[in-house]
A protein has these predicted regions:
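Conserved N-terminal catalytic/coupling substructures associated with nucleotide/phosphate chemistry
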Residues: 1-180
Length: 180
């Protein structure tokens, strides 16, 4: 097992220890409807900013009630919307562009797909022209929650871009490579 897989297994275990889904964490089993994923990216990205988190996550293969790993049949590399790969299709609907990642992790109890979603920076993340937010564990339209929208804009002002984490879980050699 490589260090990236070990990191994500540890991350999955830490996230599963949280008592409930949060405004920056969503569990799914096999529901990978592209439209919903796009809306969740917007909601989780915006909520991560309000919650002062660098990233938000969707975990496929984890039961949202028990937090037990049950495995998923979702394979993001094979998933499509029409004839288009799901990653490309999702990226085209997000504004600003969001550098989300799908990571497939094989655990002892089954496959888990982790979607890492960066927190919104400088402007709310929208999907197909609509900005979403999490209210508890529910996805809602941001415009319907003016107090959340105000908090989101205040969050952009509180942490300058230069103080944000550029990348996580990167080896020293990778940092050197990226700087060259």
């Amino acid at each position: 097992m490589n260090s990236e897989q070990e990191y994500y297994i540890s991350l999955i275990d830490r996230l599963r220890q949280l008592p409930v889904e949060t405004e920056w964490l969503e569990y799914k089993m096999n529901n990978y409807e592209p439209e919903l994923i796009g809306e969740y990216i917007s909601a989780l990205s915006n909520s991560a900013t309000i919650c002062n988190k660098e990233k938000a996550y969707i975990l496929w293969g984890v039961n949202d009630k028990t937090h037990e790993i049950e495995g998923t049949s979702f394979s993001p590399k094979k998933a499509k919307k029409g004839n288009e790969e799901i990653e490309n299709w999702l990226a085209g609907g997000l504004k600003p562009r969001v550098d989300f990642r799908f990571i497939e992790v094989n655990t002892e109890k089954g496959k888990v797909v982790v979607m890492e979603i960066p927190a919104a920076v400088n402007t709310p993340t929208s999907f197909k022209g609509t900005e979403f937010i999490r209210v508890g564990s529910y996805k809602k339209k941001l415009k319907e929650y003016q107090e959340k929208e105000r908090k989101l804009w205040l969050s952009f002002e509180q942490k300058p871009f230069e103080l944000r984490v550029a990348m996580e879980n990167v080896t020293a050699s990778k940092v050197t490579e990226l700087l060259d």
